[in-house]
Amino acid sequence: MMYEMVMTLATLAIGKIGAASDARNIRDYPLAGRELKKAAGMVQCLAEEQLPQWVSHKSSSDTLGKDLPVEASIGFCEAFQILCLAVGQQMAVATVLAKPTVPNYSLLAKLCLGISEHMELFNSTMNSKAALEKEKIDSDFFTVIAFETQFHRALSLYFSARSLWDAHDFGVAIPMMKDAIAAMETRKTSASKGIPAIKSKTSYLKFLSDDLKETRSHMESLLQSWIKENSTIYYEDVMSVVPREKILQKGLMMMKPDPYMFEAVEPLLLSTDFRKG
C-alpha cells in the first residue's frame, strides 16, 4: 500500500504541474504559480516524510530506486521541489513585467538571479542525490535547465543595468548591460559559459528561438541608445569592468512550498453486519 500511496501523491503533484502548464495568457500566471507551490509542497512531503518512512520499513531484499519510477525517489523529489519553486517564480516575474507600470528593476534582478540559482541547484541535486533517476530522463530536458539557468542569470544582469541607469549611475549601467549581452550569447562548448545552442528543429528550445533573437536585439539596441545618450548628455566616465560591489552576489527566492499534510481520518470498516440479533 505504501507504493500506491506514494504514487498517488506524486500523481497529484504532476496534476498540479499540468494545471500550471495550461496557463495560456498572462492572466493565468498567478494561478499557475499557486499550483506550482502546491506541487512543491506535495513532493516535499514525499521527500521528507513518506519516502523516508517507506525506506525505513523496506526489507533488505528490496531494491529502492532501480526499478521504480523516478517519482518514488527521495533525491528526485528533493530536486523537483526546487524546480517547482523556480518555475513558480518565473510566473511571478512574468506577471510583474506584464503590468503597464515601470517595474522595480532592482527587485526583478534579485528574483531572476534566484530563479537561476534554483535551476542550478535542481541540476546539482539531481547529480548528487538522484543520479540513477537522471539517467531515466531525456537528456534534452537538462539542456532546457541549462538554458533557463543562464538565461535568467543574463536577465538579472539586464535588470541590474536598468536599475543602475534609472539611478543615474550611467558609467556602471553601460558595462553591466554589456555583461548581460555577453551572458546571453550562445556558448561554444557544453562546459563554457553562455546559452545552449538551439541545434535543430526538434530541440525543446526551438520555440524560444524567435524570442531569444528579439531579446538580444532589444538589449543591444538599448545599449547603443545609452552609449549615445551618455556621450552627448551626461559625459560620465564609463568603467571597463563592473565593480564587484555593484554585482548581485545572491538572488531572492520568494516562492515557498504550500505544506501538504495527510488528514487524520477514522478507519473505514471493511464490512458491516446489519442483521438484527
Labelled PLM ranges:
Residues 1-64, 69-81, 88-94:
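A structural/positional concept
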Residues 1-2, 71, 99-107, 127-277:
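Eukaryotic intrinsically disordered, low-complexity segments enriched for acidic and Ser/Thr/Pro residues
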Residues 6, 20, 32, 39, ...:
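Alpha-helical solenoid scaffolds that mediate protein-protein interactions
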Residues 34, 41, 110, 117, ...:
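Charged/polar, solvent-exposed surface patches and flexible loops
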